[in-house]
């Protein structure tokens, strides 16, 4: 397993477990998922306050409460800013959200807080103030964003003193807008249209980790591409029983940059069958990047 070093004693696995679907699991199923991940060297668990209406965090928190010492083995991340159909970066909402997250997870701190979706009416200085407050109180260690482009991050950073450590973005073999424009520079192809202001390049230039969510998904919440009839060539190469060449998923030209050189990329994987998917991605991670969902 490869890890990102955020500080001298803080390492984040380059495969992460997305916890959205934990809301549909029993406590025992969630425990199996978590312990299987930890046994594979995965210490990164990604939550959001809206996952299952908070139930995902509650189930996870019950597990932490029942197993003293388990929390110390983890890097736990959660996200906030979505509520009642709005994206809300107000200080009041962020404070309230973090307190709710901590209560549901039954912990006194989270390692990372991401702002889930960009608030067009954000007040950067207000966000900066609440970030400092949360850091001083020990409730949050690191801060980042999710689904933001370059200029949104620059705007936010104008009022935030702390470095944004991560941007969580959708990316998979079947969803590649993040890198299409870079590959199709100076062409007439639709893929050459710059839709995100060069967000990937901006993150790399500024040491911001890219967390890719739903790396097995097609389109926007279109289900996974594994076993899907729309991708016969790809699926003909994938064996779930024995992976002889884990790099096969990154052989396509559009994803060649994901080979093991890029240590500041993180992938987040949603897992319903933990033993199969974690075993497969553990093998694949030797030549690729982090998974987070």
Positions of PLM-derived features:
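Structural preference for beta-strand elements that scaffold enzyme active sites
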Residues: 5, 12-16, 43-44, 73-79, ...
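Residues at alpha-helix caps and immediate loop-helix transition turns in enzyme cores, especially N-
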Residues: 29-30, 56-59, 90, 123-127, ...
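Short amphipathic alpha-helices and their capping/turn segments at secondary-structure boundaries
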Residues: 1-8, 58-68, 97-103, 153-158, ...
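Active-site mouth loops of central-metabolism enzymes
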Residues: 18-28, 80-92, 116, 121
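Beta/alpha (TIM)-barrel catalytic core signal, keyed to glycine-rich beta->alpha loops juxtaposed to Asp/Glu
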Residues: 118, 122-293
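Short, acidic/polar
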Residues: 25-38, 89-105, 151-155
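Active-site groove signature of glycoside hydrolases
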Residues: 102-123
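N-terminal binding-site loop/beta-alpha segment at the start of enzyme catalytic domains
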Residues: 1-74, 136, 218
């Amino acid at each position: 397993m490869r890890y990102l070093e955020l500080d001298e004693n803080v390492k984040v696995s380059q495969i992460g477990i997305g916890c959205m679907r934990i809301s549909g699991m029993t406590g025992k199923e969630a425990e199996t998922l978590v312990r299987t991940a930890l046994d594979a060297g995965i210490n990164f668990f990604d939550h959001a306050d809206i996952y299952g209406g908070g139930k995902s965090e509650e189930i996870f928190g019950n597990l932490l409460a029942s197993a003293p010492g388990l929390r110390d083995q983890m890097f736990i991340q959660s996200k906030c800013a979505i509520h009642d159909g709005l994206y809300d970066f107000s200080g009041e909402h962020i404070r309230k959200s973090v307190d709710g997250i901590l209560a549901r997870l039954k912990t006194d701190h989270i390692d990372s807080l991401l702002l889930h979706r960009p608030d067009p009416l954000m007040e950067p200085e207000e966000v900066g103030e609440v970030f400092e407050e949360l850091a001083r109180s020990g409730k949050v260690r690191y801060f980042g964003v999710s689904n933001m482009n370059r200029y949104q991050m620059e705007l936010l950073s104008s009022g935030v003193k702390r470095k944004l450590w991560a941007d969580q973005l959708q990316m998979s073999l079947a969803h590649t807008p993040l890198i299409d424009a870079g590959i199709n520079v100076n062409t007439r192809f639709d893929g050459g249209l710059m839709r995100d202001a060069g967000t990937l390049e901006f993150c790399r230039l500024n040491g911001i980790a890219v967390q890719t969510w739903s790396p097995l998904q097609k389109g926007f919440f279109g289900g996974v591409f594994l076993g899907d009839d729309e991708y016969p060539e790809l699926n003909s190469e994938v064996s779930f029983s024995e992976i002889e060449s884990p790099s096969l998923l990154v052989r396509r030209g559009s994803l060649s940059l994901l080979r093991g050189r890029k240590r500041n990329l993180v992938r987040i994987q949603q897992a319903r069958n933990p033993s199969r998917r974690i075993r497969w991605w553990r093998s694949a991670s030797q030549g690729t990047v982090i998974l987070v969902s």
